[in-house]
Amino acid sequence: MGLPWYRVHTVVLNDPGRLIAVHLMHTSLVSGWAGSMAFYELALFDPSDPILNPMWRQGMFVLPFMTRIGITQSWSNWSISGDSVVNPGIWSYEGVAASHIILSGLLFMAAIWHWVYWDLELFIDKRTMFPVLDLPKIFGIHLLLSGILCFGFGAFHVTGLFGPGIWVSDPYGLTGKVQQISPAWGADGFDPFNPGGVASHHIAAGILGIIAGLFHLSVRPSQRLYDALKMGNIETVLSSSIAAVFWAAFVVAGTMWYGSAATPIELFGPTRYQWDQGYFQQEIERRVQANIDNGNSIDKAWSLIPEKLAFYDYIGNNPAKGGLFRVGAMNSGDGIAVGWLGHPIFKDKLGNELFVRRMPTFFETFPVLLVDENGIVKADIPFRRAESKYSIEQVGVSATFYGGELNNATFTDPATVKKYARRAQLGEIFEFDRTTLKSDGVFRSSPRAWFTFGHLIFALLFFFGHIWHGARTLFRQVFAGIDPDLDEQIEFGTFLKLGDTSTRRQSV
């Protein structure tokens, strides 16, 4: 037929059998990719250190999504939670991956069958003997089935009635585990960080979908509405489907980037706003002060800070820090975190405490400034030493570590103090292994940023696709120059198929 690449989809116009075939093949490809990608990630994933080397530092993309809906165990006898593993069966990382690949194969064969046996009696209207799809009825069927699935996920899987529950954690990402969730039916259910809203919203949306599906199965649209919205044209279905997809993509891009109960930081990494607002820094300071108030010494107070919490307070884990087009996992940048060196407290020669000003997210370099409790600069690393007034040497700055591997160690050598002052710009100070992965020292982004970027781009493209196909289907007669008074009962284009001489052009 010699179709250009952007017109090839016309071969399934008014061809219900092959329309089903291409959708089966598409689903097969998606399912096959998901299963294959899961196996690929499992081959690379190192589960040995969930605190300093979590899945999001290793660049895992599909594993966090599997984990958040209750999969925590592997056939290789490891568990995300560190618990003992006893025959996890199909509800494991490998089990789910294999299930997707098997499903992909079945869908592949089904697609081939429907492509070969496209001319089924099922698609022929007995009254007209023409192939037909009752699109309003199909819409009702899809609404009903998706409503049942949505309701079932919220009412059974999330609540643990028949399923494991979902991943739930505290606000600081320290105690995450899979647990059963009770639906939140009050105003608190609208809090995006309340996991109870995940259950209640799926239940409510599922019930709404079931009711809407039954409505569209039992109530036919009026002729005027049917014609106005071109309900007999498959391109109408394409346009409205694209609208649903781009809207969903915009929503999940927002919940991922800004954070929500469905995107826990233990699985996807922190958000950039937690660095910008000093979220973890403030919690660490609060805990240290509480420990001191309870009678602990300052070194003991810092030693009680969880290493996991300290690691979140490091700019290298900021998803906006890595740049979108730097290939590789976070570990390929600054390396694999080995241990927390501790929290450095800087003081001048008079004993006044100084604080290193932290680097903002979008700076690649930033002056090293040490300020007092009032925010006044008292020391720095000067650009031009000849004009320096506040250099580390002149002010006599020392650094003492509390907590971590350098607990109670004090450094007065200016070169060493400068080194730790520079590193303190980036948050808590950690030791990294840059040899194992040949890490290059350039920050990488986390799966949180990749997911957000990808879904925003696709949402934008699909938005234009919705406008394009919506305009084509609503104004097809206008674009084609067809007489608006044509007395054909179906709109032009329903039976328009290239090379099909039986397509009706006028009323019988």
From Swiss-Prot:
Residues passing through the membrane, by range: 21-36, 101-115, 140-156, 203-218, 237-252, 457-472
Example GO biological process: photosynthetic electron transport in photosystem II
Subcellular location field: Plastid, Chloroplast thylakoid membrane
Stored Gene3D superfamilies: Photosystem II CP47 reaction center protein
Tree of life domain: Eukaryota
Statement: the UniProt record of this protein carries the keyword Membrane: yes
Membrane topology field: Multi-pass membrane protein
Organism: Bigelowiella natans
GO cellular component, one term: chloroplast thylakoid membrane
Quaternary organization: PSII is composed of 1 copy each of membrane proteins PsbA, PsbB, PsbC, PsbD, PsbE, PsbF, PsbH, PsbI, PsbJ, PsbK, PsbL, PsbM, PsbT, PsbY, PsbZ, Psb30/Ycf12, at least 3 peripheral proteins of the oxygen-evolving complex and a large number of cofactors. It forms dimeric complexes.
Keywords assigned by UniProt, alphabetized: Chlorophyll, Chloroplast, Chromophore, Membrane, Photosynthesis, Photosystem II, Plastid, Thylakoid, Transmembrane, Transmembrane helix
Gene: psbB
Family indicated by similarity: Belongs to the PsbB/PsbC family. PsbB subfamily.
A Gene Ontology molecular function term of the record: electron transporter, transferring electrons within the cyclic electron transport pathway of photosynthesis activity
Functional summary from the UniProt entry: One of the components of the core complex of photosystem II (PSII). It binds chlorophyll and helps catalyze the primary light-induced photochemical processes of PSII. PSII is a light-driven water:plastoquinone oxidoreductase, using light energy to abstract electrons from H(2)O, generating O(2) and a proton gradient subsequently used for ATP formation.
Signal peptide start and end residues: none
Protein known as: Photosystem II CP47 reaction center protein
Cofactor binding note: Binds multiple chlorophylls. PSII binds additional chlorophylls, carotenoids and specific lipids.
